[in-house]
Amino acid sequence: MKVILTENLSSLGQIGQVVNVAPGYARNYLFPQGLALEATGKNVKELDHRKRVLAAKREKIRQEMLSVAEKINQVKLVLRRKVADEDKLYGSVSAADIQSALEERGFIVARKDIQLDQPIKQLGEFTVSVRVDAQIAATVGVVVEKEE
């Protein structure tokens, strides 16, 4: 019996896939649990329509994320910190500091999306990668200056 999956099932496939299963498995488990629909002509057409609508939404969101990434690429953050000897900072500039500086500029970014291997502990210019979306990354310039 052919069914359309409405949930991701590791043993069968992804949402929206049409798979062939035993009729008893479909009637006794998949249909009552709401994990699948029977693959009738009407359901297949509805699935195709949903896929097209979802693809259009994804493309729109992708374009918006590309626009945000472009704006972030143009940002240069200037952070002032107290300095000890030889241009070393008393503390450090962490992902949280970069996140709050970006928020002041109007960009809402999760701290985990800021790709900073180690905190910045010296004066200078640095580039930091910021993940805007799963496949889209931007780079932000970070300048650490001496606070007077």
Swiss-Prot record:
GO aspect biological process, one term: translation
Alphabetical keyword list: Ribonucleoprotein, Ribosomal protein, RNA-binding, rRNA-binding
Domain of life the protein comes from: Bacteria
GO MF term set: rRNA binding; structural constituent of ribosome
TM spans (from-to): none
InterPro entries: Ribosomal_bL9, Ribosomal_bL9/RNase_H1_N, Ribosomal_bL9_bac/chp, Ribosomal_bL9_C, Ribosomal_bL9_C_sf, Ribosomal_bL9_N, Ribosomal_bL9_N_sf
GO CC annotation, single: ribonucleoprotein complex
Family as reported in the entry's similarity comment: Belongs to the bacterial ribosomal protein bL9 family.
PANTHER family the record matches: 50S RIBOSOMAL PROTEIN L9
Function: Binds to the 23S rRNA.
Protein name: Large ribosomal subunit protein bL9
Species this chain originates from: Syntrophobacter fumaroxidans (strain DSM 10017 / MPOB)
